């Protein structure tokens, strides 16, 4: 968690030094890619991110390699579909894998 916050604030500091640039920051509770219709759809989540075009996305409620997600690394899946770099921070062990938060960013963490 500290590592993610340090990465986020470091990116904010570096990018804020360039006054002409704009930093697009997004936060997104993805509910493990389950929509309000109860359907798990990684592409739908990726489309929301891609349409927003953020520099950094802070993502909550991510599964990593759980039975519930069919052993999918959800953040990695989203990273591939958005062409952003992932950084995952597990909060708890859950359902045979991990559950936590993550960051997707244009720059390599």
Regions found by a protein language model. Give the residues of each.
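Sec-dependent N-terminal signal peptides
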Residues: 4-15
């Amino acid at each position: 968690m500290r590592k993610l916050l340090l990465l986020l604030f470091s990116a904010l500091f570096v990018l804020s030094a360039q006054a002409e640039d704009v930093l697009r920051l997004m936060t997104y509770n993805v509910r493990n890619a389950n929509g309000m219709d109860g359907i798990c759809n990684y592409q739908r989540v990726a489309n929301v991110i891609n349409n927003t075009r953020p520099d950094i996305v802070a993502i909550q409620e991510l599964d990593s390699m759980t039975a519930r997600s069919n052993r999918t690394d959800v953040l990695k899946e989203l990273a591939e579909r958005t062409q952003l770099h992932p950084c995952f921070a597990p909060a708890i062990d859950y359902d045979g894998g991990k559950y936590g938060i993550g960051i997707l960013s244009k720059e390599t963490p």
